[in-house]
Amino acid sequence: MMPTIASIALVLLAYLSGSIPFSLLVARAWGVDLRVSGSGNVGAANVWRTCGFSAFALAMGGDMLKGALPTIAAQALGLSPLAVVIVGTAAMLGHTRSIFLGFRGGKAVATGGGVVLTLAPLVALPGLAAWAVTFGITRISAVASLTAAAVCGIAAAVLLALGMLPPAYAIFVWGAVAAIVFLHRSNIHRLRTGTENRFEKLF
């Protein structure tokens, strides 16, 4: 009974953790309301766009930690891979459908990245590298995020085939990739029409 109670409690805590709008709070400390500034998105990329790199680094760190910490707790409690994945999913759901923002939120790139970095560093690190390289070349956050998601999906498939990744973790990664693509559908439309926002100034 206790593991079940602990699992349920951790899922709820993960959702609440994911719901904390770190990017919105950091931007507010800089005197900016993300909901009416930049792209209007409450994610870390919009913090960079509207508040600068220092604020972005804080927001990114917070958004990653709110995915990573519940996942680490689930692993520390010895939960099964499936239960750990459910906890990570709850954190991502909290970010995208925050109880503190009227069940709206960001696009789960940083929070999902924190979960994947905890579950499978060999999946997350190539994704982070792909994000950095793609963003440096294009200066378009959506392109970098979608590229990173694709690389993580491929890395998960390779590691699963090599027996180096639990199937539940691989399925989580692929589900996260699908969710990130879905949440970027408006960005994809703007990319097709050539109207997607590009960073003019990085630092």
Curated annotation (Swiss-Prot):
Signal peptide: none annotated. The chain crosses the membrane at residues 5-25, 50-70, 72-92, 115-135, 140-160, 162-182. It is a multi-pass membrane protein. One of its GO terms (cellular component) is plasma membrane. It comes from the Bacteria. Pathway: Lipid metabolism; phospholipid metabolism. The keyword Coiled coil does not apply. InterPro entries: G3P_acylTferase_PlsY. It is found in: Cell membrane. Its main location: membrane. Coiled coil: none annotated. GO terms for biological process: phospholipid biosynthetic process. The keyword Transferase applies. Its EC number is 2.3.1.275. It holds the Pfam family G3P_acyltransf. Keywords: Cell membrane, Lipid biosynthesis, Lipid metabolism, Membrane, Phospholipid biosynthesis, Phospholipid metabolism, Transferase, Transmembrane, Transmembrane helix. GO terms for molecular function: acyl-phosphate glycerol-3-phosphate acyltransferase activity. It catalyses: an acyl phosphate + sn-glycerol 3-phosphate = a 1-acyl-sn-glycero-3-phosphate + phosphate. Probably interacts with PlsX. Catalyzes the transfer of an acyl group from acyl-phosphate (acyl-PO(4)) to glycerol-3-phosphate (G3P) to form lysophosphatidic acid (LPA). This enzyme utilizes acyl-phosphate as fatty acyl donor, but not acyl-CoA or acyl-ACP. HAMAP family: PlsY. Belongs to the PlsY family. This is Glycerol-3-phosphate acyltransferase. It comes from Roseiflexus sp. (strain RS-1). The lineage of its organism: Bacteria, Bacillati, Chloroflexota, Chloroflexia, Chloroflexales. The gene is plsY.
